[in-house]
A protein has these predicted regions:
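DNA breakage-rejoining catalytic core of tyrosine-based enzymes
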Residues: 1-16, 76-85, 101
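Basic, Lys/Arg- and aromatic-enriched nucleic-acid-binding interface segment
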Residues: 2, 12-41
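N-terminal core-binding DNA-recognition domain of tyrosine site-specific recombinases/integrases
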Residues: 26-29, 79, 112-118, 133-139
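Alpha-helix N-cap/helix-start motif at helix boundaries, enriched for small hydrophobics
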Residues: 34, 46-51, 162
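C-terminal catalytic core of tyrosine-transesterase DNA break-rejoin enzymes
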Residues: 36, 40, 143-168, 176, ...
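Conserved tyrosine-mediated DNA breakage-rejoining catalytic core shared by Y-recombinases
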Residues: 50-88
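Catalytic-site neighborhood detector that most strongly recognizes the C-terminal catalytic loop/helix
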Residues: 69, 73, 166-190
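C-terminal catalytic core of Y-nucleophile DNA break-rejoin enzymes
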Residues: 73-93, 103-125
Length: 190
């Protein structure tokens, strides 16, 4: 991703709007999972396209609290444990109830796995149709990382924890993802 033109993160109002819009789509359950894998788990388009049911289910077929993202599904060798929000886990449970838990979690309308390119295109079309200029498949990841950075200190964490959540090899890369908040700067100064 170019450092001069980053994908815009989504604010809370935009996130609610997307979730409402997705609820009215043909594949609402699947689409909700794809969106939440982006904004809650911070997955890249390639990772969303390739995450498999076996990465989120235990031996008995129950959902776990984390995605065990394999290196082959991640950028570079950045696989690892990706923790799930309650709303993502709930959305996955809804999808599991209407899906066969084999191979990839999200599939195209024809039942085939998404490619990284088709997943990227799905997000681009979603944001274009909603009029969200500057948003792309990476907007959800930037949204997640910015949220983590703003709230990690409330949980006795640090930016190194955010770096680990983002699965970045350097703290500098993680810092580039974090959106500046003028409101937060004003409040901290008093």
């Amino acid at each position: 991703m170019s450092l001069t033109k980053q994908a815009k993160p989504l604010n809370e109002k935009q996130q609610r709007f997307v979730l409402s819009h997705i609820g009215d789509t043909r594949d609402a359950i699947r689409n909700r999972v794809m969106f939440l894998l982006s904004i809650d788990a911070g997955l890249r388009a390639k990772e969303i396209a390739s995450v498999e049911w076996r990465m989120v289910l235990d031996a008995e077929g129950n959902l776990t609290d984390a995605i065990r993202l394999e290196n082959k599904s991640a950028k570079g060798s950045s696989g690892g444990v990706v923790y799930m929000s309650e709303r993502l886990k709930s959305a996955l449970a809804d999808l599991l109830a209407v899906s066969k838990p084999i191979s990839t979690i999200v599939k195209t309308k024809s039942g085939k796995p998404f490619s990284a390119a088709s997943m990227t295109n799905w997000f681009w079309l979603l944001y274009r149709d909603l009029g969200f200029e500057g948003c792309s498949s990476h907007s959800g990841r930037r949204t997640a990382i910015t949220k983590w950075a703003r709230t990690i200190s409330q949980h006795n964490g640090s930016m190194r924890d955010v770096q680990a959540l983002a699965r970045h090899s350097s703290l500098q890369m993680t810092q580039r993802y974090v959106e500046v908040s003028e409101d937060a700067m004003k409040r901290v100064v008093g």
